[in-house]
């Protein structure tokens, strides 16, 4: 208990500052602070090529003396095996120019600081666990639905890794070709969940960006159907206490209620849990940290390496 009290005091002290990098496929967000209520500076910029983008991050962080550690919540796939020669590297990403890019090593060498790294969704999950919608939970999922789909899982109070890290966006869900003849947009699998339900897939299927589709458009029923199919699988496999859904596509207010309703229907009464059947509005929720979940997750990753 004394250690936990010491750790809590240290992590929440305004004198202990950490660097945080939310490394996304379209933008990077850099911040320095100690928690949600103590962000000293923040900067965001477009993701270009690795040398330029990493250079801008380093220039930002090098303005601050006395940082204790740096956390990186990054798009992937990532090599997260500590014993691997390519630990902390982006591997087989479809993001042009970023294949086999060292992230953790580049920042550690340049700054001489400990670096914590994980996927963007695992980082956001950690942030929600520390400060947001998953506080006091041991088992939950964090999903992001945007230009890609990713998921982070907490099981028994720990982020799930394993051989690699979960790729929840690349599971297969039933695809009714008669109702939805769209072939899918995933360059690896075609009509996996990511290929059917990202913002990119919606734009290619319907010929316009998701945010421009009206509330009553059939796109939203179909989107909710695919997402609920995935959630039903996750519920049956991982039995989470809560599911948090973020990302640009989920910012459309009509979508979350549709997903909840379809999830309850798809489970068919088999999972007899009042949390789902009677309180779905508290079971499938939006991130409490909103758009800050990623960068605050990176901050939590920095704190975790001390």
Tell me what each language-model feature is.
Residues 1-69, 78-86, 105-113, 127-137, ...:
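ATP-binding/phosphotransfer module of carbohydrate and carboxylate kinases, centering on a glycine-rich
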Residues 43-44, 95, 164:
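Short clusters of small/polar residues that mark proteolytic maturation junctions
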Residues 72:
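Conserved phosphate/oxyanion-binding catalytic-loop motifs
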Residues 75:
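Conserved NAD(P)H cofactor-binding loop of Rossmann-fold oxidoreductase domains
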Residues 84-99:
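A charged helix-plus-loop insertion that forms the helical arch/lid used to bind
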Residues 115-119:
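General beta-strand structural signal in soluble alpha/beta enzymes
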Residues 122:
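Short alpha-helical segments enriched in small residues
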Residues 135-194:
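Glycine-rich phosphate-binding loop of actin/hexokinase-like ATP-binding domains
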């Amino acid at each position: 208990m004394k250690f936990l009290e010491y750790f809590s005091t240290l992590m929440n002290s305004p004198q202990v500052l950490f660097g945080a990098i939310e490394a996304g496929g379209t933008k990077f967000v850099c911040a320095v602070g100690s928690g949600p209520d103590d962000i000293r500076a923040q900067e965001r910029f477009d993701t270009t090529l690795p040398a330029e983008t990493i250079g801008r991050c380093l220039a930002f962080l090098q303005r601050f003396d006395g940082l204790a550690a740096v956390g990186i919540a990054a798009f992937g796939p990532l090599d997260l095996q500590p014993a691997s020669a390519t630990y902390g590297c982006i591997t087989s990403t479809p993001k042009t120019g970023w294949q086999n890019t060292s992230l953790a090593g580049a920042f550690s060498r340049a700054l001489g600081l400990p670096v914590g790294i994980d996927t963007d969704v695992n980082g956001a999950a950690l942030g929600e666990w520390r400060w947001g919608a998953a506080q006091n939970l041991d088992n939950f999922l964090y999903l992001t639905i945007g230009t890609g789909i990713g998921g982070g899982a907490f099981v028994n109070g720990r982020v799930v890794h394993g051989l690699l890290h979960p790729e929840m966006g690349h599971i297969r869900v039933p695809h009714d070709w008669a109702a939805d003849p769209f072939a899918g947009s995933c360059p690896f699998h075609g009509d996996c969940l990511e290929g059917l339900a990202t913002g990119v897939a919606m734009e290619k299927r319907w010929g316009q960006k998701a945010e421009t589709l009206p509330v009553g458009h059939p796109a939203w029923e179909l989107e909710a159907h695919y997402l609920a199919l995935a959630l039903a699988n996750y519920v049956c496999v991982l039995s989470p206490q809560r599911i948090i859904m973020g990302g640009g596509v989920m910012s459309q207010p009509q979508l979350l209620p549709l997903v909840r309703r379809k999830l309850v229907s798809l489970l068919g009464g088999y999972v007899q849990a009042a949390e789902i059947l009677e309180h779905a509005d508290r079971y499938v929720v939006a991130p409490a940290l909103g758009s800050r979940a990623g960068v605050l997750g990176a901050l939590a990753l920095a704190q975790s390496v001390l």
